[in-house]
């Protein structure tokens, strides 16, 4: 399987395992991963996910152009249909899939094109020292199609986003850290251990509260402040009625570690 999906107690680990093509993805593999993400979303025993790439060279380099096809005319001929490939699902991690469980991107190498866009669609990004980032689609005659043109200018200064989008400029892990695109840069050998450490810190919190906090952020970011505050209040009332809040309050009073269940 190109997308390895492992369940390690409360943590789901997704590994893009296609190193011969720098962990690029075909439309069929995007569909496979989306099915795994839906399983992760619905599994109440899984609280947080980690996304990484196999090997030490590439995290993901986006869509595999050899399998995706293209709309240009063949040499010496008229424009024809793109080579057949299984269609990608309408809802994916990068577009449309509602997923309130947090995802950590453990960027172990090249994150170019759609691979960078996958990392941008995650909630927290950690990077190995050798990681590289870039929206390189314009160098191939394309524009970002997995959300890069929309997410990146919302995350970093517009001018820097323009450099990356309009010039296909690549940046290293330290510059990504300086731009707050990644939360921490670590040696390659420590990357997955660090990602799991951060995931476990999330798992120490009440899962329903974590998922609802992410929902509040994601839904509220495009709202007016007034509408966002109303949303926060609505979601806050939901978690205040939860078993986890009752357990958290009881554990606080009894000075013990809470036993959260996600309800």
Regions found by a protein language model. Name each.
Residues 1-56, 69-70:
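Conserved CoA-thioester-binding segment of acyl-CoA-metabolizing enzymes
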Residues 1-9, 43, 56, 67, ...:
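C-terminal alpha-helix plus adjacent terminal tail
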Residues 94-208, 234, 241-242, 246-247, ...:
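Crotonase-fold acyl-CoA enzyme core
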């Amino acid at each position: 399987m190109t997308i390895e999906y492992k369940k390690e107690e409360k943590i789901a680990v997704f590994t893009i395992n296609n190193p011969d093509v720098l962990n690029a993805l075909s439309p069929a593999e995007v569909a496979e991963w989306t099915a795994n993400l839906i399983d992760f979303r619905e599994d109440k025993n899984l609280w947080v996910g980690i996304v990484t790439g196999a090997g030490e060279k590439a995290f993901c380099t986006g869509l595999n152009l050899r399998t995706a096809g293209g709309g240009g005319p063949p040499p010496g001929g008229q424009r024809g249909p793109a080579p057949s490939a299984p269609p990608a699902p309408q809802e994916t991690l990068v577009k449309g899939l509602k997923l309130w469980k947090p995802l950590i991107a453990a960027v172990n190498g090249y994150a170019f094109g759609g691979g960078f866009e996958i990392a941008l669609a995650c909630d927290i990004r950690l990077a190995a020292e050798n990681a590289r980032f870039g929206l390189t689609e314009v160098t191939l005659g394309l524009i970002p199609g997995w959300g890069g043109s929309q997410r990146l200018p919302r995350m970093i200064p517009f001018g820097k986003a323009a450099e990356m989008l309009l010039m296909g400029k690549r940046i290293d892990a330290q510059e990504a850290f300086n731009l707050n695109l990644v939360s921490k840069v670590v040696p390659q050998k420590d990357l997955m251990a660090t990602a799991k450490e951060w995931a476990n810190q999330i798992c120490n919190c009440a899962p329903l509260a974590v998922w609802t906090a992410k929902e509040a952020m994601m839904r509220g970011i495009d709202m007016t402040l007034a509408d966002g505050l109303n949303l926060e209040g609505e979601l806050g009332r939901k978690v205040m009625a939860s078993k986890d809040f009752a357990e958290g309050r009881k554990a606080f009073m009894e000075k013990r570690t809470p036993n959260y269940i996600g309800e």
